[in-house]
Swiss-Prot record:
Residues 1-27 form the signal peptide. Keywords: Antibiotic, Antimicrobial, Disulfide bond, Glycoprotein, Immunity, Innate immunity, Membrane, Secreted, Signal. Gene3D superfamilies: Bactericidal permeability-increasing protein, domain 1, Bactericidal permeability-increasing protein, domain 2. Transmembrane segments: none annotated. The N-terminal region may be exposed to the interior of the granule, whereas the C-terminal portion may be embedded in the membrane. During phagocytosis and degranulation, proteases may be released and activated and cleave BPI at the junction of the N- and C-terminal portions of the molecule, providing controlled release of the N-terminal antibacterial fragment when bacteria are ingested. The N- and C-terminal barrels adopt an identical fold despite having only 13% of conserved residues. Residues 221-285 are annotated as: Central sheet, part 2. SMART domains: BPI1 (SM00328), BPI2 (SM00329). It is found in: Secreted; Cytoplasmic granule membrane. InterPro entries: Bactericidal_perm-incr_a/b_dom (IPR017943), BPI/LBP (IPR030675), BPI/LBP/Plunc (IPR032942), Lipid-bd_serum_glycop_C (IPR001124), Lipid-bd_serum_glycop_N (IPR017942). Induction: By lipopolysaccharide (LPS) through TRL4-TRIF-dependent pathway. Expression in Sertoli and promyelocytic cells is enhanced several-fold by all-trans retinoic acid. This is Bactericidal permeability-increasing protein. It comes from the Eukaryota. Residues 464-483 are annotated as: Central sheet, part 3. It comes from Mus musculus (Mouse). The lineage of its organism: Eukaryota, Metazoa, Chordata, Craniata, Vertebrata.
Length: 483
């Protein structure tokens, strides 16, 4: 892409509020920085409240009963039972950032409808029917404190919850004796109001502890990339908020699976002002990319063998000992019409540089050539050093960072070693450049197109994204959607 100038559970959206947030510490710079704007918080709030609404709508209202006494009529009893919430409407949920480390979700003007049955007894008289309870002006305010545990996982607790109900109205139907109930409707309304009031915050707290927090725990901070590497997205410090963004700083470090050694490079300092027009903003440092290269280099997987039919029938060059006759006649004479095998590897890690002009690097490879004897054993011929300049174009697909490597010029060759005497490397320039561009580069880009996972919670994907290259880091700004 071009550089721009400018159904899992819905709780997964609230997870987004926590995944992208930690505080910068003086001791450790992050390899990956992420922020969520107010627009992103609003998106997450809307989706999270949908799930909360389901929980609130499932409120279990217990049966209750009482007695009444009316002058000249004496005592009687009443009972309300089989009550169920018929609707819990939440019109305009809001979310705001608390200073330092939390979020406040508040709901105003919500309403609840409850249907049920009633029964009344007075001496030998018995009556009953249906009722409808309308609860108006329900408000809920809850604080979520975000943090991290010792392993770098996200934690969240509901530190405070308050609720309020403005008014309750009951509508009785089904019997001529309903007027008895209406005489003391305020007492009944108050009793039902208190029951609902006590239930609301309990459900909110239970939802955070039984649904949101376990979901956070399922998000692995060590994300498997492939059979060779994983990436560490653990939090470096407690979660924090500013007045405009929920900010997060993660380790952002690739490593060879099963091997975790100290690295010879360090993350750069990333400073940028996010665009609040997008939901999320991610700063991806050159450290992130370069630890990926280091992991593959340390594992010994940055190599490719070209031989056999791949070389002899490539369509343009038949790379065998007969081909070497021009500059290595001794080889052609000693090993007539035998196959040649090439081993292309990266003896030293490639360092990727990110600048405002884009992502670039200067790969240095090594090619070892062998004669393949009839018994499949190898005879070493020579070693070539190879260097060129290249660029990396990045893109995002769903929840992954993908890329494409492009060569900026022809490979320059240098003879580093020869078992059969020196020769001019110019004889091999065309064939090496052709083989790398047609066989090696497509394999690299095939891996880059598979991509690398970004720290997004389950059920969340990118949309409307753009990239900005800065000095030492790449900025990704995007909106999000649910799948």
């Amino acid at each position: 892409m071009t550089w721009a100038p400018d159904n899992v559970r819905k709780w997964s959206a609230l997870l987004l509020l926590a995944i992208i947030g930690t505080a910068l510490t003086a001791a450790t710079d992050p390899g990956f920085v992420a922020m969520i704007s107010q627009k992103g918080l609003d998106f997450a709030c809307q989706q999270g409240v949908v799930e909360l609404q389901k929980e609130l709508q499932a409120i279990s209202v217990p049966d209750f009963s009482g007695v009444f006494k009316i002058k000249h009529l004496g005592k009687g009893s009443y009972e309300f039972y089989s009550m169920a919430v018929d609707g819990f409407h939440i019109p305009n949920p809001k979310i705001e950032m608390l200073p330092s480390d939390g979020l406040r979700v508040f709901i105003k003007d919500a309403s609840i409808k409850i249907n049920g049955k009633w029964m009344s007894r007075k001496n030998f008289l018995k009556a009953g029917g249906n009722f409808e309870l309308s609860i108006q002006g329900v408000s809920i305010s809850t604080d979520l404190i975000l943090g991290s545990d010792s392993s770098g996982h996200i934690t969240t607790i509901c530190s405070n919850c308050d609720s309020h109900i403005d008014s309750v109205h009951i509508k009785i139907s089904g019997s001529m004796l309903g007027w008895l109930i209406r005489l003391f409707h305020r007492k009944i309304e108050t009793s039902l109001k208190n029951i609902i009031y006590k239930k609301i915050c309990k459900i909110v707290r239970d939802s955070v502890s039984s649904k949101l927090q376990p979901y956070l725990k399922t998000l692995s901070v060590i994300t498997r990339v492939d059979d060779v590497t994983s990436v560490d997205y653990s939090l470096l410090a407690p979660l924090t908020t500013t007045n405009q963004f929920l900010e997060g700083q993660l380790k952002g470090e690739f490593f060879w699976r099963g091997h975790r050694d100290p690295l010879p490079i360090h993350p750069p300092v990333m400073r940028f002002v996010p665009n609040g027009a997008y939901m999320v903003c991610m700063g991806i440092s050159d450290y992130f990319f370069n630890t990926e290269v280091l992991a593959y280099q340390q594992s010994g997987t940055l190599k490719m063998t070209l031989g056999g039919q791949l070389l002899s029938n490539n369509g343009r060059f038949q790379l065998n000992t007969d081909f070497l006759r021009t500059f290595l006649p001794k080889v052609a004479k000693m090993f007539p019409s035998m196959g040649v095998q090439l081993l292309i590897s990266a003896p030293v890690p490639v360092h990727l540089s990110i600048q405002p002009s884009g992502l670039s690097f200067n790969p240095k490879l090594e090619t070892q050539a062998f004669v393949v004897l009839p018994n499949a054993s190898l005879v070493p011929l020579f070693v070539l050093g190879m260097k060129t300049n290249a660029s990396l174009e990045v893109d995002a697909e769903e929840n992954r960072l993908v890329g494409e490597m492009k060569l900026g010029s022809r490979w320059l060759l240098e003879l580093k070693e020869s078992k059969f005497g020196p020769f001019k490397v110019e004889y091999l320039e065309d064939v090496i450049n052709y083989l790398v561009s047609t066989l090696v580069l497509p394999k690299i880009n095939e891996r880059l197109r598979r991509g690398f996972p970004l720290p997004l919670p389950a059920g969340i994907r990118f949309s409307h994204f753009t990239f900005y290259p800065y000095q030492n880091f790449l900025l990704l700004e995007a909106d999000l959607h649910l799948i």
